[in-house]
């Protein structure tokens, strides 16, 4: 099996890589995340996964299309539906395309690791793209190791632990409660 694994970030990769290696599967990571904003956050996450891959002796491929303009155009009419409309499909489709064009026979994604993502939708998209591109989809419910992976990423590997999913709107969501409290305190 020649596995290309879309990697959203280093912390989410830890458990996925460890569990696949325990099965005798050596993934190649694929970094394609044009939904991560602002740019300094994108760079921080990219550098972190680069260092993680070097530490773990993993092959990693970087597709550095930074897509703020496209992201804004695509999601402006439906900010609430951004994950379904843009964030998941654009990254997964590009991963399957790259796999097909570069001789990978199987794809998976670290998006299946997070307990905060739309797991069933991600799985459905991967199954759809698998049929469309003729590349197998390796499904694993990596969520079973969420806390184990989180602990290793943070405490053993000292990886950068981001505070929000990636896009500028998810960063706003991170502060929503604080914004509401500030409105009550200061008016507005």
Spans of model-derived segments:
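Nucleotide-activated chemistry modules centered on ATP-dependent adenylation/adenylyltransferase
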Residues: 1-188
